[in-house]
Amino acid sequence: MTFTILPAVDVVNGQAVRLDQGEAGTEKSYGTPLESALRWQEQGAEWLHFVDLDAAFNRGSNHELMAEITRQLDIKVELTGGIRDDASLERALATGATRVNIGTAALEKPEWIADVIRRHGEKIAVDIAVRLENGEWRTKGNGWVSDGGDLWEVLERLDSQGCSRFVVTDVSKDGTLTGPNVDLLRDVAAATDAPIVASGGISTLEDVLGLAKYQDEGIDSVIIGKALYEHRFTLAEALEAVEKLG
């Protein structure tokens, strides 16, 4: 099975942006989301990681724009940001997105997420953003600012509820181009049978290939944002490199 690369398009106020360590106010704009999404599609992406940051930060929504773009694309879309109840979930699923990621609500509403996982199965992934605090990995919600509990306890609960996939981000790495936290990702993969999507810190092709080595441990995908926008390497180069691994 080929390692999957998901180029990211994060949206703030109708623009494609990247943040530094997920912090509001650190946005750097990269044009329109449609331009970015079409560029990644043209370069051979099979998936797009599409994030409504305004919704994630509880300060608005780019839903209509993102729904329209999702409908225009020929590739699979993983949609995330601000999906916290049945209404926002149904709206996200109605865009035709292949997968919907849920973050904060998976931490704060355990009974609801259990029901969502039961009803929608593989269409749902859970975003687990974490930060190391006083030697403990703590989960983060609401735009990565609120505490959602101990990582391993949260993971055990969601795993027992049947979550089909986890997207794991070390917040301190996101948007920094300093390399992924491979040890953390491997530890999480070892604690669940669900596949892991790695997120945060990718800077070089070596970073991508370094993660792809651990497919047999359960890390089967990676989200890449700033490295592509800052031209550290092209999406085509990354896709070719992982294809050679087989």
UniProtKB/Swiss-Prot annotation:
It comes from the Bacteria. Keywords: Amino-acid biosynthesis, Cytoplasm, Histidine biosynthesis, Isomerase. One of its GO terms (biological process) is L-tryptophan biosynthetic process. GO terms for molecular function: 1-(5-phosphoribosyl)-5-[(5-phosphoribosylamino)methylideneamino]imidazole-4-carboxamide isomerase activity; phosphoribosylanthranilate isomerase activity. The active site is at residue 10. Its EC number is 5.3.1.16. GO terms for cellular component: cytoplasm. It catalyses: 1-(5-phospho-beta-D-ribosyl)-5-[(5-phospho-beta-D-ribosylamino)methylideneamino]imidazole-4-carboxamide = 5-[(5-phospho-1-deoxy-D-ribulos-1-ylimino)methylamino]-1-(5-phospho-beta-D-ribosyl)imidazole-4-carboxamide. It is found in: Cytoplasm. Pathway: Amino-acid biosynthesis; L-histidine biosynthesis; L-histidine from 5-phospho-alpha-D-ribose 1-diphosphate: step 4/9. InterPro entries: Aldolase_TIM (IPR013785), His_biosynth (IPR006062), HisA/PriA_Actinobacteria (IPR010188), Isoase_HisA-like (IPR044524), Isoase_HisA-like_bact (IPR023016), RibuloseP-bd_barrel (IPR011060). The keyword Cytoplasm applies. SUPFAM superfamilies: Ribulose-phoshate binding barrel. Belongs to the HisA/HisF family. NCBIfam families: hisA-trpF. This is 1-(5-phosphoribosyl)-5-[(5-phosphoribosylamino)methylideneamino] imidazole-4-carboxamide isomerase. It comes from Corynebacterium efficiens (strain DSM 44549 / YS-314 / AJ 12310 / JCM 11189 / NBRC 100395). The gene is hisA.
